[in-house]
């Protein structure tokens, strides 16, 4: 028997978030959405932790790099949540910095 995977998406573009949540939900994943960094960081301090964080780089309150840095500084298992950074920025240096800040992978937005 398989266990459903739980993801958290921190994304301020509501339309994109709705599409991702619907697509992943239709494929058997449970996805919670937070529209900003502050609510996302609060969610990451609750149990159960997500199996993956999908994190936008450009958010209205804190950027995704700062969210990633703060996540990695949290005590316990929260610091180990895998992070997939998602952004519209195409600069290769953004990828390098994102990975240095603790992201596990980095994908450009379509």
Question: What are the residue ranges of the model-derived segments?
Answer:
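N-terminal/domain-start alpha-helical segments
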Residues: 1-110
């Amino acid at each position: 028997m398989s266990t459903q995977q739980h993801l958290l998406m921190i994304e301020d573009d509501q339309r994109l978030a709705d599409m991702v949540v619907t697509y992943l939900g239709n494929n058997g994943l449970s996805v919670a959405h937070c529209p900003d960094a502050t609510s996302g960081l609060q969610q990451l301090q609750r149990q159960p932790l997500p199996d993956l964080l999908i994190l936008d780089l450009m958010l209205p309150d804190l950027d995704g790099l700062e969210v990633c840095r703060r996540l990695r500084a949290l005590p316990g298992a929260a610091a180990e949540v895998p992070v997939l950074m998602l952004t519209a920025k195409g600069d290769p240096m953004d990828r390098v910095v994102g990975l240095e800040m603790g992201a596990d992978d980095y994908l450009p937005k379509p």
